[in-house]
From Swiss-Prot:
Lineage summary: Bacteria, Pseudomonadati, Pseudomonadota, Gammaproteobacteria, Pseudomonadales
Domain of life per record: Bacteria
Active-site residues, record numbering mapped to chain: 201
Protein name, per record: Pectin lyase
Region (Disordered): 254-274
Compositionally biased region (Polar residues): 256-274
Length: 312
């Protein structure tokens, strides 16, 4: 059984600021079936859970997570199909790495999301692939690939691939109801990710939280950022490819704050005022140019069959 043993190498962003450790303080456990996954990931004991056989369910199957876990895909087998990971009230300090998330096209309701984090803090999602499926604008689907919101906090999504899906990612309390209880949640970093063939929400629909989004490559899209209720977004050196000719990089509802620097092409249709915070007040990081980010993510984003390469 071979798997990435880089541990906390490449940890960056708000997950770094929160000192995420996952389960690396505990033993390594080989996971080969759904029952083993459920039995181990739901506890709070530190463990490194290595997916050593692809795990598939014929219908949507929710798996509740505990705390202090590293769930990591082996270099040989690393696919979770129709397995939906859900946070619980005890969830915190979790690393998801080198995993392939697949789901059937008929699992498409609004809340059908394979990674759903609405509790806890200290999450690192790294080198994962959310591979989607064929879609059309009229297929009736409402599902998304990933959600981090409500009171979930201090998270980083890095070096991941998101592709072939009508809706992409959604962050923050999922309503435009100006609910002050959710202001500031989540604090989230998105960096060195590749988004391809998605209609909207790549890199995401963002509400309420603080979002640092840098060095991502978004290609074949209709709308990129959707800035909604009370979101505070810092965008740096992101590369928008096919689809940018329609100026859909930013869908700004005018109800948050937004600052972009050095993205390609420049974002010019901002309605909201500029953001009043800086990422460097929370953690240090190194920027690539937008062109360098495009090249890096095409080569290195997503789950891998050999050693992981990190953008930070």
């Amino acid at each position: 059984m071979s798997y990435p043993e880089s541990k906390l190498t490449g940890l960056t962003g708000f997950a770094l600021a929160a000192k995420v450790t996952g389960g690396w303080a505990g033993p390594v456990v080989s996971i080969t079936n759904l029952d083993q996954l459920k039995a181990n990931i739901g506890t709070v004991t530190p463990q490194v859970l290595v997916i050593n056989s692809n795990i598939s369910a014929s219908s949507l199957t929710k798996v509740n997570m505990g705390a202090n876990k590293t769930l990591i895909g082996s270099f040989q087998n690393r696919t979770l199909e129709n397995i939906h990971l859900r946070a619980t009230a005890q969830s915190q300090n979790i690393i998801l790495q080198n995993l392939i998330f697949k789901h059937s096209a008929n699992i498409k309701a609004n809340d059908d999301i394979q990674v759903y984090l609405n509790y806890g803090s200290k999450y690192w999602i790294d080198h994962c692939s959310f591979v989607g499926h064929s879609w059309s604008t009229t297929d009736g689907s409402e599902d998304k690939l990933l959600y981090i919101g409500e009171k979930a906090d201090y998270a980083t999504i890095s070096n991941c691939f998101f592709g072939s899906h009508k809706y992409g990612l959604i962050f923050g309390h999922p309503a435009d109801d100006n609910n002050a209880a959710f202001n500031g949640y989540p604090r989230l970093t998105l960096c060195h990710n590749r988004f391809d063939n998605m209609e909207v929400r790549a890199p995401g629909l963002m509400r309420y939280g603080y979002f640092h989004v840098y060095n991502n490559y978004i290609n074949k899209f209709h709308l990129g950022f959707t800035l909604a209720q009370n979101a505070n977004i810092l965008s740096e050196s992101n590369y928008f490819g096919e689809g940018s000719q329609n100026n859909g990089m930013l869908d700004d509802k005018g109800s948050g704050t937004f600052t972009d620097t050095n993205s390609v092409p420049p974002i010019t249709n901002q309605k909201s005022p500029k953001a009043q915070w800086t990422a460097t007040s929370n953690y240090a990081y190194t920027l690539k140019t937008a062109a360098q980010a495009k090249d890096f993510t095409q080569k290195n984003a997503g789950a891998q069959a050999a050693a992981l390469v990190f953008g930070s």
